Amino acid sequence: MNITLLKSKIHRANVTEARLDYVGSISIDEKLLQASGILEYEKVQVVNVNNGARFETYTIATQEEGVVCLNGAAARLAEVGDKVIIMSYADFNEEEAKTFKPKVVFVDENNTATKITNYEKHGAIF
């Protein structure tokens, strides 16, 4: 049996752009993708902290520093300045699931990684 677990998370990133007239996806600073272990074109779940919206899309890496841009229909689900949590998931067998720890990237107001951990303390946001 496989179990789906959180693999990676970029925590409370600031939306820097929202482009409705784009094909789709979420563009993310490639440095944040690398730090989190999220791959380009990987399916992600995005949660808007400001309005509670949750949606799935895929990532596009950008070389523009600090960019987190919602593209296409997703642009309707957040405004510039909203905080979002970007998460990817992976399937593990039961033995792998017992020891796996997700990678969590915390960012500042400029979407620069300030802390990278392989665990997350529940109840704390920083």
Swiss-Prot record:
Keywords: Autocatalytic cleavage, Cytoplasm, Decarboxylase, Lyase, Pantothenate biosynthesis, Pyruvate, Schiff base, Zymogen. Pathway: Cofactor biosynthesis; (R)-pantothenate biosynthesis; beta-alanine from L-aspartate: step 1/1. Binds 1 pyruvoyl group covalently per subunit. One of its GO terms (molecular function) is aspartate 1-decarboxylase activity. Its cofactor is pyruvate. It is found in: Cytoplasm. It comes from the Bacteria. GO terms for biological process: alanine biosynthetic process; pantothenate biosynthetic process. Substrate binds at T57, G72, A73, A74. Its EC number is 4.1.1.11. Gene3D superfamilies: 2.40.40.20. The active site is at S25 (schiff-base intermediate with substrate), Y58 (proton donor). GO terms for cellular component: cytosol. The modification Pyruvic acid (Ser) is found at S25. CDD domains: Asp_decarbox. It catalyses: L-aspartate + H(+) = beta-alanine + CO2. Heterooctamer of four alpha and four beta subunits. Belongs to the PanD family. HAMAP family: PanD. This is Aspartate 1-decarboxylase.
